[in-house]
């Protein structure tokens, strides 16, 4: 059990085992706050900085899945599939710091009335509480973008400011895609990533 735990810490970059020397702790990695290679819910990241997170400009809609989204979520293609789109701006105190669009199949809600759900809560909490689905891992793609004009306005960006766009497919414990997320981050966040040479 201890050997497995050490192996996991080594995979995550916290430890390095060196033959003839022993096990070394990489203190720089231990002190990293927002690791892009570890999925952290953005409310937690904002609280860790000492700010209070909240969502506003919240929009929840039902939309028919495009062929691309149906493929990403591995939905049946023999009939139109309805998706739930949750769009929101997230604030840190009074500063707009990101805009997210979360997309879930309506079927995950098992005929539950959407009107009774507080969609201002973190999407992973909503998936766990109302869909009985735990997200365990994501596949993410990163892009530096200028972003759509409407989102730039909501985030109060200066003309020269870029956004970090994170596109994710989120998987359940059964390795099934259950959620697509597209998030535009401002430079409020300082992300780090631990990369190992292969």
Predicted regions and their residues:
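All-alpha effector-binding/dimerization core of bacterial HTH-type transcriptional repressors
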Residues: 27-198
